[in-house]
Amino acid sequence: MIGGLCKGKDLIVLKIGENVKDEDGYYTAFKHLTEYCLRFTDNVIVAGTYWKAPKKEEAMIRVARENNLKYVPLFWIYELYEEEVKAHVGDTIYNIKGKPYTIKTDFIITHPNNNGMKMIADEIFKIIML
């Protein structure tokens, strides 16, 4: 599966969940993924969802606690700073290589803009540095 991506890493950050539809099976699936990652490193950080999703968030917190892992709550970013962190049609965002992309459709506007992504990264980085 993702073993090639995990092998030799000293840190794995699990940042998933926003697009998962099966909330009832989320705990089991997330637990399985976490246990798989723990086979490669003990240093796994669980990052919560960007959009409030109580059932998924509860599952991630539970798995983090069961495995004595650090957990980063993130939903508050969108809740408190929605207008500053959500993308708008016409905004320019940048991919990981710095290439600009102008948002042309409504699909992407619910996602974090560059400011939102920076806030997410900053919160995760704070936990890494603990």
Explain the meaning of each model-derived region.
Residues 1-130:
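Alpha-helical cap/lid subdomain in secreted, periplasmic
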